Amino acid sequence: MLWKLLRLFIIIKLIQLAIIYFSPCQFDTSSELIIQNLSSTSSSKSYYNVIITTILNKLIVWDSVYFNDLFINPIQFEHQFVFCPGWIQLIKLLNIKNYYTAQLTSILISNLCHFASVITLYYLTNEMDMKFGLVSGLLMIISPAGVFLTGNYSENLSNLLTLLMFLTYYKSINFNDVKQPSNKSITNILGYIISGIFCAINFTVRANGLLLGVIYVFDLYHFIQNKSSSQIILSIITGSILFMTFLMTNIYHYIKFCPGREWCNNTFPSLFQFAQHHYWNVGFLKYWTPNNIPNFILVLPVLIFNIYSLGYMYQELPKNRKLLPLIVINGLIVVGGTFFWNIQILNRITSFSPLIYWTLAYNLKKPWAKYAIGYCIVWNFVQTGLFAAFLPPA
């Protein structure tokens, strides 16, 4: 099993790196400024050969411009706070002084997280009483997130933490406890609390991880049905780990910037919400403009497949009640991405969702599934070329 996954993983990554290396030029050359700035001293020059250095330079596009800057320099300005600190601080902990070494290290760690996510999905699939763990893992390797899972974006670490949360959660819950009115009970207290810790850490890596907390709201509702005070308290404690992380993050932002900024006087003074709205044009239907039609077209296959997966897995609920929290979480991400956020990010931020891989695995023998897999493979490489040229989608 491990060798089959690793073999495809290496093949896909090598092809992507080859495309990046041989891509002729970049549409936007602004990333050269950060390269010149961060590698200006002799101690920050590249120690690596021309192939590795060229690939590293071409991977500094879109959000990677910010990540590579923040791996070396502190977060100072409001707009930088949309990049949650967890992934950045992990690289900073390594205390790497050379810019190129920091970038290469972050890429290697990111890819290790990608492969660890694939392995975790394999075990999660088995935990959900499904028989296609290997197929699901292979499908995650060719995820439409593509080259974003090869560069040093935060998606891979977030995906790994999300899947570890799901795995520890499902190992800690009995969904067939006939003694309880909700048929649901906690069987492993430590595992359940650990799932909450993974959830909270994930929020420090990607802010949309806050939506994962809905899983503990479901639990609270079910345990109230059970009239089990101990399990009610456990669900509140575990969910509160995420809530306290969210609260402390906002308190830190307030102490750092307030009262001098306009958002400090809001009813709920959130720097992240302000920065997303003010600097990144995030808000209800704000992205629904004619100039963004190409981004809607680029994300349409992923959007359609996510919606189809939600419907397909909803039909599976009578046979597998465990799916409900995953359906709700995936649905919230799709709604947020479609109506509130920059829609093209759905290409990468839905890569955590087991539902899309399970739906494809369920229907593997159907003709449309072969077309879907073909699309994933082709899109991986087309997107890599676009990424290397600093072209959308971001």
Curated annotation (Swiss-Prot):
It is a multi-pass membrane protein. PANTHER family: GPI MANNOSYLTRANSFERASE 2. GO terms for molecular function: alpha-1,6-mannosyltransferase activity; glycolipid mannosyltransferase activity; mannosyltransferase activity. It is an enzyme of class 2 (transferase). It comes from Candida albicans (strain SC5314 / ATCC MYA-2876). Keywords: Endoplasmic reticulum, Glycosyltransferase, GPI-anchor biosynthesis, Membrane, Transferase, Transmembrane, Transmembrane helix. It comes from the Eukaryota. GO terms for biological process: GPI anchor biosynthetic process. The keyword Transmembrane applies. This is GPI mannosyltransferase 2. The chain crosses the membrane at residues 2-22, 47-67, 104-124, 132-152, 185-205, 232-252, 293-313, 323-343, 371-391. It holds the Pfam family Mannosyl_trans2. Its EC number is 2.4.1.-. Pathway: Glycolipid biosynthesis; glycosylphosphatidylinositol-anchor biosynthesis. It is found in: Endoplasmic reticulum membrane. Mannosyltransferase involved in glycosylphosphatidylinositol-anchor biosynthesis. Transfers the second mannose to the glycosylphosphatidylinositol during GPI precursor assembly. The lineage of its organism: Eukaryota, Fungi, Dikarya, Ascomycota, Saccharomycotina. Belongs to the PIGV family. GO terms for cellular component: endoplasmic reticulum membrane; glycosylphosphatidylinositol-mannosyltransferase II complex; mannosyltransferase complex.
